[in-house]
């Protein structure tokens, strides 16, 4: 059984840090499928958040550069989403080949208008530029295709995030002819 206990940082319009506690437990089918099909490579391995140490790392210690903050939601958002919809969300920590925590990824099953998978991830600023982002994306693709090879993967990115766009195209995604709000959508089938 996975135990979630997290303090989510929320900032109001006066930039006051407000802590919200979420405590719950779950063991959903999607989590079970992800755990059975997790893929690793020579640079990274991915593990669902199963203890407070990983949870604390994901929501408090794992940091990105200030220039990247506009591109990703904080881990606390994904952990909160998993609490509200545990059947379709699996937050995880990314480890490098030296067993050090180096990032955060959250797998998501899309069940609304289009069926498919999605993920959101980032590498800690202290471990960037070491090919860990690409290695994580490759492992994520393999993991999700092992869960269901017929399910497409939909990723979104800001229109000015050219680095993510190049990565997605190099990994076999194609740019969709529709947007998600203002964001570009990439599809891996």
Where are these regions (language model features)?
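Active-site acidic-Proline motif in GNAT/NAT acetyltransferases
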Residues: 124-130, 159-160
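Conserved GNAT acetyl-CoA-binding A-motif
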Residues: 146-156
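Conserved beta-strand-loop-alpha-helix junction that forms the acyl-donor binding cleft
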Residues: 154-165, 181-183
């Amino acid at each position: 059984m996975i135990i979630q206990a997290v303090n989510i940082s929320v900032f109001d319009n006066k930039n006051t840090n407000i802590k919200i506690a979420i405590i719950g437990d779950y063991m959903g089918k999607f989590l079970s499928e992800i755990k059975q099909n997790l893929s690793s490579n020579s640079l990274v391995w991915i593990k669902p958040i199963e203890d407070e140490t990983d949870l604390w790392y994901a929501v408090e210690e794992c940091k990105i550069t200030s220039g990247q903050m506009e591109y990703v939601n904080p881990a606390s958002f994904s952990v909160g989403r998993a609490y509200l919809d545990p059947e379709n969300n699996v937050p995880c920590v990314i480890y490098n080949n030296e067993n050090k925590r180096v990032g955060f990824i959250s797998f998501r099953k899309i069940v609304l208008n289009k069926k498919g998978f999605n993920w959101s991830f980032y590498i800690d600023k202290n471990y960037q530029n070491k090919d860990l982002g690409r290695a994580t994306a490759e492992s994520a693709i393999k993991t999700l295709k092992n869960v269901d090879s017929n399910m497409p993967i939909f990723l979104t990115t800001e229109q000015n995030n050219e680095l993510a766009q190049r990565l997605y195209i190099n990994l076999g995604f194609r740019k969709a002819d529709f947007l998600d709000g203002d964001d570009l959508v990439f599809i891996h089938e």
